[in-house]
């Protein structure tokens, strides 16, 4: 199950890269969400020895996630910037980053080292990193199947994480589990939005692109 979870952790980045390559467009992708994920993966890479449950992926996977996240950000704001939904991706990341930093300082699990605070910050940030993507979904005129597949893969990863925690409950810690449950709730909101697009496309000014 752990191997499946590792593969599902990489899958969202693969899907986004496939979308960028196949469509030559970053439409429907929140650049601000990708920046937040790049911060998350950067912090997790710093956990060199894998001592944190937040950075428990194999080192090669953490490095791969870091590199692909920065590549995606570069492609969105670089070669494909003309297709970027800038007018809809308007949520200020500062409103998400500051509360996460405060939570990392005051709601950490005992360890007060700088590395522990940074990893706790990454965990809280990972909860809300999808929020700019949800905001963008509410404003764009189309949502393609790549974006839907991206959201599904993220939700599947978190579901596998929780199942793996259930199998190894004695080794679990609270923070990653809270991250997973809250993220899944956010993904449910995203799926409800996409479902509404499909069910009411004659009544709203945007559609789901097949």
Question: What residue spans do the PLM features occupy?
Answer:
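Alpha-helical membrane-protein topology signature
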Residues: 1-210
